[in-house]
């Protein structure tokens, strides 16, 4: 027995006793009856040069580099790799040929369905298609493509397609360069002519604009001269208007001052009269206040005394009412306390009664369970025992006797004796029953007659003692 530990890029594949299939672990105990294999899961680069042929039957070589390794993030894929590939070294010819066969097969099938132009121009899409198809095949071995790099396509010896394609591109580039040079020369000569024409045009344009500007300057000078003369005239008129306005304002101020002086004289006279009236009014008000204070002093003292008296009486009455209310409140509180105490006592009594009923019910339940067990759970026997023990039958008999005491009922008892005869013989049983029926009929009719007074039909016969009773009833009726 040994304890095995795998490195960071390794796993332990353990088989043997106690393991159903394969146990994958990084570290584990390995017993003598178990086998342990260490396999590496680090990816490996595989370089290939795949010879393929396009749909136009043009052969070429596809250099490719694939980085392939076990899928460590999928336990099922890792188990597949351990079962199928772990016994071979990842650099062995077996693994190399397996991967190369899958890549070459899928690449050739894909290239055979594409043209050379599609392969050459769609390198990115071509790489994705190869990646997906190869990965689909590698899934069954638990392998995954970490990276796939398709290099530049190469010609097969004897088939220089890419060489001719490069020469074609070079010739097209050279021809395009010549065309570009010719166009540049043409643009240069045309540009020189255009510059010369533009120079002449611009010179003529500048001369014309100079003449226009000189004429404009002369007109502007004349306009400025007229404008200055007009402004001088306007200034003179404004000054004359200002002088006239100042004269008018002076006359207005003189008239206003004269008016103000006359108004001031009138206001002074009126102010003296108003002051006299105000002083006279104050004198009269002071006289009225003096008389008012005198009257107030006379009547207010009397009213104050009456007010104090009324206030004292009201306070005394309020005090008496408060005391009465407090007494009534105290009495109500005592009554409420007494009522509460009585209610508590009644509640306690009811509570004790209820507890007694519960205890009695428990005792009766135990009693009934004991009785029921004694009669082997026979409810009818227990019911009969309880009715006999409690005197129910005696009470029923007394009640019935009291009920029919004053009714004076008629009770008929009869027996035809057919039971004993019915027990004898087998062949005569039917005849005995019929005979018993006939024997029973007369007593029944007699009983009906005694109880109800009704006679049987005439075809049956006449009852004994019926005629005397009828005659007796008739005599009573006549009497």
UniProtKB/Swiss-Prot annotation:
Annotated lipid attachment (S-palmitoyl cysteine): 36
Protein topology in the membrane: Lipid-anchor
Coiled coil: 227-251, 306-326
InterPro entries in UniProt: Band_7, Band_7/SPFH_dom_sf, Flotillin_fam
Localization terms from the record: Cell membrane; Membrane, Caveola
Record carries keyword Cell membrane: yes
Alphabetically ordered keywords of this record: Cell membrane, Coiled coil, Lipoprotein, Membrane, Palmitate
Cell membrane keyword on record: yes
Modified how: May be palmitoylated.
GO cellular component, one term: plasma membrane raft
SUPFAM superfamilies, per database record: Band 7/SPFH domain (SSF117892)
Role played: May act as a scaffolding protein within caveolar membranes, functionally participating in formation of caveolae or caveolae-like vesicles.
Protein family: Belongs to the band 7/mec-2 family. Flotillin subfamily.
Name by which UniProt lists this protein: Flotillin-like protein 3
Native species: Arabidopsis thaliana
């Amino acid at each position: 027995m040994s304890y095995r530990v795998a490195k960071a890029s390794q796993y332990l594949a353990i088989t043997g006793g106690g393991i159903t299939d394969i146990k994958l672990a990084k570290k584990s105990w390995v017993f003598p009856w178990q086998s342990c294999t260490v396999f590496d899961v680090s990816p490996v680069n595989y370089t290939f040069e795949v010879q393929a042929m396009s749909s136009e039957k043009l052969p070429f070589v596809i250099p490719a580099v694939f980085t392939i390794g076990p899928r460590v993030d999928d336990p099922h894929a890792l188990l597949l790799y351990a079962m199928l590939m772990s016994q071979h070294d990842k650099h062995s010819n077996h693994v190399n040929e397996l991967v190369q066969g899958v890549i070459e097969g899928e690449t050739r099938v894909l290239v055979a369905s594409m043209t050379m132009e599609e392969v050459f121009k769609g390198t990115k899409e071509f790489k994705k298609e190869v990646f997906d198809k190869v990965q689909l095949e590698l899934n069954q071995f638990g392998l995954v493509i970490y990276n796939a790099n398709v290099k530049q396509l190469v010609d097969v010896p004897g088939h220089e397609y890419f060489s001719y394609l490069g020469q074609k591109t070079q010739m097209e580039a050279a021809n395009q360069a010549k065309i570009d040079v010719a166009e540049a020369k043409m643009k240069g000569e045309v540009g020189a002519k255009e510059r010369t024409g533009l120079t002449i045009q611009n010179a003529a344009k500048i001369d014309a604009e100079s003449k226009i500007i000189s004429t404009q300057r002369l007109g502007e000078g004349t306009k400025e001269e007229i404008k200055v003369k007009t402004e001088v005239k306007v200034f003179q008129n404004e000054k004359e208007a200002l002088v006239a306005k100042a004269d008018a304002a002076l006359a207005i101020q003189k008239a206003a001052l004269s008016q103000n002086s006359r108004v001031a004289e009138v206001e002074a006279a009126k102010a003296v009269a108003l002051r006299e009236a105000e002083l006279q009014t104050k004198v009269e008000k002071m006289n009225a206040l003096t008389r008012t204070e005198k009257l107030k002093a006379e009547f207010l003292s009397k009213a104050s005394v009456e007010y104090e008296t009324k206030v004292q009486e009201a306070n005394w009455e309020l005090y008496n009412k408060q005391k009465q209310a407090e007494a009534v409140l105290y009495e109500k509180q005592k009554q409420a306390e007494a009522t509460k105490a009585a209610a508590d006592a009644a509640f306690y009594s009811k509570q004790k009664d209820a507890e007694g009923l519960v205890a009695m019910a428990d005792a009766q339940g135990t009693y009934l369970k004991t009785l029921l067990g004694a009669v082997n759970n026979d409810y009818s026997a227990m019911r009969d025992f309880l009715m006999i023990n409690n005197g129910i039958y005696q009470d029923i008999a007394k009640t019935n006797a009291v009920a029919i005491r004053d009714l004076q009922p008629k009770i008929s008892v009869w027996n035809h004796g057919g039971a004993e005869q019915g027990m004898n013989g087998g062949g005569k049983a039917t005849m005995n029953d019929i005979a018993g029926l006939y024997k029973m009929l007369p007593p029944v009719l007699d009983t009906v007659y005694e109880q109800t007074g009704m006679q049987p039909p005439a075809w049956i016969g006449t009852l004994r003692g019926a005629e005397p009773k009828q005659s007796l009833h008739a005599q009573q009726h006549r009497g």
